[in-house]
Amino acid sequence: MGKFTGKLIISDLDGTLIPRGGVISEENRRAIAYFVGEGGLFSVATGRTPEAAAGYVEGLPLNAPGIFFNGAMLYDWQRKQVLKTLPLTAGDENNLWPAFAREALRRFPEACLEVYAEDNCHVVTPEANDDPRLPYEYYRYAHTDLERLTDTGKTPWLKFFACDRHEHLERYVALAEEMGVAALANGFYSEDNYYEFVAKDVSKGAMLETVREMLPGVEIIACGDYLNDRELLAAADISVAPATAHPAIRAAAKLKGPAVEEHLLVWLIDRL
């Protein structure tokens, strides 16, 4: 029995554990290693794929299931095994998602649109529209003709992602409502210029309830900074937000920590 036995810390990555454009600090790494060494459980909850997260979290003692695709996948780090997926396109009997994607391609010529499947990130817009982050990510992606992805029974979509100017995304969301796909999904801003759709009842917080069922009796401490972390923090026993969090997220958090650049996990673990 260690000091932190019976506790799980599950943290968002970008903006919470990782500064924008940065890496996980050595200070945070040492704090996490100490926490796990004293019996604690640690994992991450992110919009990223496991592959994309791996480049950042390599070397961390991830000893609890991780949440990916903003709640559409639960993944066992130690066994490198997908435990659960909740596809966006499940139940879309009228194939509305491919129809919406076609119309979005037509109406938003500056957008970068990405279809996330279990095996790859498919960019369905021209290379000239690519989100500048793509070459620097730790995962494979391919430029794919949308028509190769319209059989969603064969290739289920886990997430549909748009990068564009915020004012364009407001019209994009209105189009989703007009075409009926918004009613099939949970849609949210993950950054000011990023909008994501996952399946209707999917969120980091909903998947955290599955983690809770797998780890009965464990106290869950969740850290997050942006609107896609709202349900995650609400589902935790203790919620934590950095000083750099979105104002609504920081206001809702039980514990209000320092900025992401000031080693949030060090601050948190010192207080447990």
Residue ranges, per PLM feature:
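Mg2+-dependent phosphoryl-transfer enzymes with acidic/Ser/Thr/Gly-rich catalytic loops
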Residues: 3-8, 25, 195-272
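N-terminal glycine-/serine-/threonine-rich phosphate-binding loop
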Residues: 2-38
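Active-site metal-binding loops of divalent metal-dependent hydrolases
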Residues: 13, 48, 224-226
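Conserved acidic, metal-coordinating active-site core of Asp-based
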Residues: 109-223, 227-232
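Short, structured coil segments at secondary-structure junctions
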Residues: 60-62, 70, 78, 179, ...
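Short acidic-hydrophobic, aromatic-tinged amphipathic segments that line or gate anion-handling sites
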Residues: 90-91, 144-148, 256-260
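Active-site phosphate-binding/coordination module
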Residues: 23-130
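Short active-site oxyanion
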Residues: 39-43, 62-64, 158-159, 218-220, ...
